[in-house]
């Protein structure tokens, strides 16, 4: 197999990864970075309705394991534009990203709403573009529930898991996150707060205002420092 054939095969494999999984391993720059996209709705134990763009957690988990175990991959970049989705699936992915030992960065583009917030803060460094937004609101549930105190306690425990994770991986306190989550003066017929990029940084939810070049520059610096 000659060099030209190898390049063609590598290009075809890269194209398939982007089309099928929304991922690519960037190997033509200074360092080898694995790029993972989280878009649309985060799909967990149940399939999303037809026509919705989704990120399937059963596709993402093996990619994160591979990024951790592959010695060629030096860093991880997670690009986010998500409306949220399954709470347990989102938290599972956030915990996995947080446990990757290699330099990692997240970049919020467009939106990082709901359970997308733990994902946005899960890496070593988080970035957000000025026009992106993040909606902080309480846990929701669709479908029939039992109207008993135990159900309410279950919701409270689930919310505490999210709040605790966000506080542990960002500069925002649990109290401030809860205050923003329960705010009633902003969303119509709902509670919560919408943060744009600058306010997300000001509130210490996100580390830095910036774009792709800023996130890659930080990753390169961390890789070289190691």
Per-segment meaning from a language model:
Residues 1-117, 121-137, 141-226:
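N-terminal organellar transit peptides
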């Amino acid at each position: 197999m000659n060099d030209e054939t190898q390049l063609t095969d590598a290009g075809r494999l890269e194209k398939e990864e982007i089309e099928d999984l929304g991922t690519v391993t960037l190997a033509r720059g200074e360092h080898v970075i694995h790029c993972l996209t989280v878009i649309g709705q985060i799909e967990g134990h149940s399939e999303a309705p037809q026509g919705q763009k989704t990120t399937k957690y059963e596709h993402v988990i093996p990619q994160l394991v591979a990024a951790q175990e592959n010695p060629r991959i030096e860093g991880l970049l997670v690009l986010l534009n998500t409306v949220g989705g399954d709470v347990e699936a989102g938290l599972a992915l956030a915990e996995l990203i947080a446990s990757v030992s290699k330099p990692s960065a997240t970049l919020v583009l467009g939106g990082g709403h709901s359970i997308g917030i733990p994902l946005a803060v899960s890496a070593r460094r988080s970035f957000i573009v000025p026009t992106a937004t993040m909606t902080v609101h309480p846990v929701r549930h669709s479908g029939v529930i039992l109207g008993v105190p135990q159900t309410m306690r279950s919701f409270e425990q689930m919310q505490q898991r999210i709040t605790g994770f966000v506080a542990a991986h960002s500069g925002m306190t649990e109290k401030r996150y809860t205050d923003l989550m329960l705010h009633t003066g902003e969303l119509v017929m709902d509670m919560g707060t919408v943060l744009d990029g600058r306010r997300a940084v000001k509130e210490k939810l996100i580390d830095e205002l910036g774009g792709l070049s800023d996130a890659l520059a930080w990753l390169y610096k961390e890789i070289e420092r190691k």
